[in-house]
């Protein structure tokens, strides 16, 4: 089996995480998984949604979007249509769930952090890149809250990252790009903590069912990939 990119089955794309990418947001990151590039910002807002008022805890939510020419042909803006698509809603909810699992919301106090993930170029794995980059932006927003003495303890409980795995030409592979994703027999996204705890698994057999053995192979690759991504997150945060 030869991957279109020439990578080994267990090999991530080249991943870079650039912090402080924009001026205004409390946390901002440009994350690149190969040719997939996403800007992730984390904005601190006073207060929490109405359903949390008076409960002494914070909130993290996310929005996700793709620039019209982030793909091979131009997509119309969802804002121009006046309605978000189902895929967009699904992905931004996934990002929010994943990041809330990384923190102790009570330690945030009654503050909200809004994550915005904007895909500027797509080549597969935009949701996993978004989660991985957004975690770093979130940490920078938390550091802002600590510097400004708006919170007294660190709410971060887990480092969290996400990666795609799949079955391509019968072989489990890590971090699918678009040519693989569009031809994979199975496509799966896994969100995990640094310790290997599972936050979410999204998987679909596209052409034929996958076996227990194949799932175990994909799970093993995902754990390896997440460990490498967390190391990159930590390296970025240490700069």
From Swiss-Prot:
The keyword GTP-binding does not apply. It catalyses: tRNA(n+1) + phosphate = tRNA(n) + a ribonucleoside 5'-diphosphate. GO terms for molecular function: 3'-5'-RNA exonuclease activity; tRNA binding; tRNA nucleotidyltransferase activity. Gene3D superfamilies: GHMP Kinase, N-terminal domain. Keywords: Nucleotidyltransferase, RNA-binding, rRNA processing, Transferase, tRNA processing, tRNA-binding. GO terms for biological process: rRNA catabolic process; rRNA processing; tRNA processing. Phosphate binds at residues 87, 125-127. Its EC number is 2.7.7.56. Homohexameric ring arranged as a trimer of dimers. Phosphorolytic 3'-5' exoribonuclease that plays an important role in tRNA 3'-end maturation. Removes nucleotide residues following the 3'-CCA terminus of tRNAs; can also add nucleotides to the ends of RNA molecules by using nucleoside diphosphates as substrates, but this may not be physiologically important. Probably plays a role in initiation of 16S rRNA degradation (leading to ribosome degradation) during starvation. PANTHER family: EXOSOME COMPLEX COMPONENT, EXOSOME COMPLEX COMPONENT RRP41. Belongs to the RNase PH family. NCBIfam families: RNasePH (TIGR01966). This is Ribonuclease PH. The gene is rph.
């Amino acid at each position: 089996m030869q991957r279109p990119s020439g990578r080994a089955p267990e090999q991530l794309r080249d991943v870079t995480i650039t912090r402080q990418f924009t001026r205004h947001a409390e946390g901002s990151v440009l994350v690149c998984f190969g040719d997939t590039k996403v800007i992730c910002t984390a904005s601190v807002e006073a207060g929490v949604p109405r359903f949390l008022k008076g409960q002494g805890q914070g909130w993290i939510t996310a929005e996700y979007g793709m620039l019209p020419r982030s793909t091979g042909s131009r997509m119309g803006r969802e804002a121009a249509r006046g309605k978000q698509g189902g895929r967009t809603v699904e992905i931004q909810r996934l990002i929010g769930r994943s990041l809330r699992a990384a923190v102790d919301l009570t330690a945030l106090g009654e503050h909200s952090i809004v994550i915005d993930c904007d895909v500027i170029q797509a080549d597969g794995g935009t949701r996993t890149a978004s989660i991985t980059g957004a975690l770093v932006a979130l940490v920078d927003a938390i550091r802002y809250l600590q510097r400004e003495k708006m919170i007294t303890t660190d709410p971060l409980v887990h480092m969290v990252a996400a990666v795609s795995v799949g079955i391509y030409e019968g072989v489990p592979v890590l971090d699918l790009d678009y040519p693989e994703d569009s031809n994979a027999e199975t496509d799966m996204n896994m969100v995990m903590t640094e310790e290997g705890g599972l936050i979410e698994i999204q998987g679909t057999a596209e052409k034929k069912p996958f076996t227990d053995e194949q799932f175990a192979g994909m799970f093993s690759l995902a754990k390896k990939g997440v460990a490498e991504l967390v190391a990159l997150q930590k390296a970025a945060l240490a700069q």
